[in-house]
């Protein structure tokens, strides 16, 4: 092939940044039989939600022995239920070696642990009051004027998401903060995706396939008891999603 021909040849791929919705499995200990039984129970609550999803194993709260971690069995169990384990989060050095052996991606922890406060020195001289720092401006809301159609995903990584149109079945909307839908919400809405438990979801007609706040979710069947096909707000109270009609909020 000539140099000019090689120059004109297009590359076979291009790397781009992407934002995707991932589900994390927060593992406390691992026993394969119990793991599969718990997994089967979760899937039975929302079979459509779990089908062919990518999954991250989070080890931030893992209390079992590292020697009990069998990622190969974990991957196989999940795969039998059409769930695809793609990586491990917040692993220590030994856990990282086990994860590498199972060809899993390694991700950092979701949040940093707090450091213990240091004791103040005895008889410390009072310091002059520092000038107050300017308050951080809240992240601007992302505003969508068009309907969000089936197969589309709209993501607000820092603030609220405001949609001035319907969200169709099969669509997905995600936000770090609140989600406002000025129309029917028929797809999936995930608010507080970085862990903000104060986030809320507002819509003019609740017909959603799934609503999630800070990882706590309800599927369509669970949402139909209160406020179905009416204007509601949804918030998290004591780790449970609570639906309140807007005329009673």
Curated annotation (Swiss-Prot):
Record has Membrane as a keyword: no
Coiled-coil region: none
PANTHER family the record matches: SEPTUM SITE-DETERMINING PROTEIN MINC
Species this chain originates from: Marinobacter nauticus (strain ATCC 700491 / DSM 11845 / VT8)
GO BP terms, alphabetized: cell morphogenesis; division septum assembly; regulation of cell division; regulation of cell septum assembly
Annotated function: Cell division inhibitor that blocks the formation of polar Z ring septums. Rapidly oscillates between the poles of the cell to destabilize FtsZ filaments that have formed before they mature into polar Z rings. Prevents FtsZ polymerization.
UniProt keyword annotations, A-Z: Cell cycle, Cell division, Septation
InterPro entries named among the record's database cross-references: CAP/MinC_C, MinC, MinC_C_sf, MinC_N, Septum_form_inhib_MinC_C
Identification of the protein by name: Probable septum site-determining protein MinC
Cross-referenced Pfam families: MinC_C, MinC_N
Assembly description: Interacts with MinD and FtsZ.
